[in-house]
């Protein structure tokens, strides 16, 4: 029974060995000297202005999580839209309508809780 897992073991072993070898080569061959110019933060080719250690408000993370949820929605809707003709008519529409209604309920909840309001309280 374990013989059937041997190819998987070989592939994982090769991947680990290759990763270690490539990281080691990069460490050996790569540049080792740091200077102040290399240690400055990069801001799109501009000279850094102000401190780079400022705090980011939680609202940015909330917007990022909402974006991920709706991005995943699009990922699920694309295969459904491509194969819609092969689905059995109305019965192919019901699961997607249910899925979209659940997501719209979540979006309504977000708006109701005023999670996207950026006004100071």
UniProtKB/Swiss-Prot annotation:
Q: List the subcellular locations.
A: Cell inner membrane
GO terms of molecular function: NADH dehydrogenase (ubiquinone) activity; NADH:ubiquinone reductase (non-electrogenic) activity; quinone binding
**Keyword terms of this UniProt record:** Cell inner membrane, Cell membrane, Membrane, NAD, Quinone, Translocase, Transmembrane, Transmembrane helix, Transport
Under Enzyme Commission nomenclature, its number is 7.1.1.-
Return the broad EC class.
translocase
The principal localisation class reads: membrane
Q: Which reaction does it catalyse?
A: a quinone + NADH + 5 H(+)(in) = a quinol + NAD(+) + 4 H(+)(out)
Q: Which Gene3D superfamilies match?
A: NADH:ubiquinone/plastoquinone oxidoreductase, chain 3
User: How does the entry describe its membrane topology?
Assistant: Multi-pass membrane protein
* Function description: NDH-1 shuttles electrons from NADH, via FMN and iron-sulfur (Fe-S) centers, to quinones in the respiratory chain. The immediate electron acceptor for the enzyme in this species is believed to be a menaquinone. Couples the redox reaction to proton translocation (for every two electrons transferred, four hydrogen ions are translocated across the cytoplasmic membrane), and thus conserves the redox energy in a proton gradient.
State the oligomer form and interacting partners: NDH-1 is composed of 14 different subunits. Subunits NuoA, H, J, K, L, M, N constitute the membrane sector of the complex.
Family affiliation:
Belongs to the complex I subunit 3 family.
Write down what this protein is called: NADH-quinone oxidoreductase subunit A 1
Q: What organism does the UniProt record list as the source?
A: Chloroherpeton thalassium (strain ATCC 35110 / GB-78)
The organism's taxonomic lineage, starting at the top:
Bacteria, Pseudomonadati, Chlorobiota, Chlorobiia, Chlorobiales
Q: Gene for this protein?
A: nuoA1
């Amino acid at each position: 029974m374990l013989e059937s897992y041997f190819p998987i073991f070989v592939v994982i072993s090769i991947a680990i060995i290759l990763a270690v070898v490539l990281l080691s080569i990069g460490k050996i061959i790569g540049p080792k000297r740091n200077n102040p110019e290399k240690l400055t933060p990069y801001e799109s080719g501009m000279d850094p202005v102000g401190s780079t250690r400022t705090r980011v408000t939680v609202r940015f993370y909330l917007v990022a999580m909402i974006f991920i949820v709706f991005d995943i929605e699009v990922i699920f809707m694309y295969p459904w839209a491509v194969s819609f003709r092969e689905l059995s008519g109305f019965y192919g529409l019901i699961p997607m309508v249910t899925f979209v209604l659940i997501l719209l309920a979540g979006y309504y909840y977000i708006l109701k809780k005023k999670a996207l309001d950026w006004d100071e309280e």
